[in-house]
Amino acid sequence: MGKYDFTSLPNRLGHHTYKWKEAETDSEVLPAWIADMDFVVLPEIRQAVQTYADQLVYGYTYASEELIKEVQKWEATQHGYHFDKEALVFIEGVVPAISTAIQAFTKEGEAVLINTPVYSPFARSVKLNNRRLITNSLVEKDGLFEIDFDQLEKDLVEEGVKLYILCNPHNPGGRVWEKEVLEKIGQLCQKHGVFLVSDEIHQDLALFGHKHQSFNTINPAFKEFAIVLSSATKTFNIAGTKNSYAVIENPKLRLAYQKRQLANNQHEISGLGYLATEAAYRYGKDWLEELKQVFEDHINYVVDLFGKETKIKVMKPQGTYLIWLDFSAYDLTDEKLQELLRNEAKVILNRGLDFGEEGSLHARLNVAMPKTLLQEVCQRIVTTFSKL
């Protein structure tokens, strides 16, 4: 029994909780989709929020020196990434930060590359900013996603790619990219004059002995064309507080980024976000270690159960609390798959096609919930698909 509570299910109904929205009108459905957790928050974060609530004024705020130091300390101690405070740029979320990077480092009509399947806001951000989307398909090998570097270089060159958005660690596949992989990516970007944005929001959730490598720690030369995005929000389940950060060590890139951020009026951050992030990084190390043990147990449970009881192929993640499920062994269409999950099993998973065309006949399962709830979700899936 650990110090923290990962067995109680907080009441999320009636709180405008996006993940549980459908459950408010259909009491039978269980959500296991959007990437937030159904766990009680770190007590020190709750205390910081309560202290904030006790203030008599909720006005404009700024990033304190204490917050900046906590972010620097966390990145240094957890990931070996040391940087000057001037490199740190706060912004309300990693997805808005990606859009800002697209606007700052490319022009309308220019090509932006992503590795698919991948988190759907990548493609959306490229398209809605009127850039040309280039998709480089990941290859599945030995139960993991890999990058086809020959095809990647071909895409970079032939499509005239200006910006590469990397998901590190990868969502939905849970791949924790090794140093050698990141080195190859950086060399190609350096060779062909491509800017790179590394979305590292899942950085703290490397599991099963794997270690996250921040892109800007791989090679000092890569800092000239790369920026790193991260946040405490995914790790500590505080996405509603709205705070993330970019680390931009090249002063010219940082100036261009901040200019675009100012043009978008994205420079004012929630005081609640600042305080929650500071508390998370100051007090959250032990909580995180327990959380990762919970995730490893939950992932092993899913792998074992589906492996024994179904034809669902499970991509065991090296990190994150998200599992990529392959239903292609069943004779189904994508529409029928969704119908079975939602209407018969009464569970909500992320639709595979939302991550790209490679997601056909796939779904993404979120295991960040008390194990009793996860068991119910998985048993419903087993019951439904054992009939096929």
Spans of features found by a protein language model:
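Conserved PLP-binding active-site segment in aminotransferase class I/II-type PLP enzymes
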Residues: 1-17, 25-28
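Intrinsically disordered, low-complexity segments enriched in small/polar residues
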Residues: 2, 16, 56-58, 162, ...
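PLP-dependent class I/II
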Residues: 4, 24-30, 35-50, 83-84, ...
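Short clusters of hydrophobic/aromatic residues that line enzyme substrate/ligand-binding pockets
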Residues: 9, 58-60, 147, 215
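A glycine-/small-polar-enriched, mobile loop at the entrance of the PLP active site in fold-type I
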Residues: 31-38, 50-68
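Conserved N-terminal alpha-helix of the aminotransferase class I/II PLP-enzyme fold
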Residues: 59-92
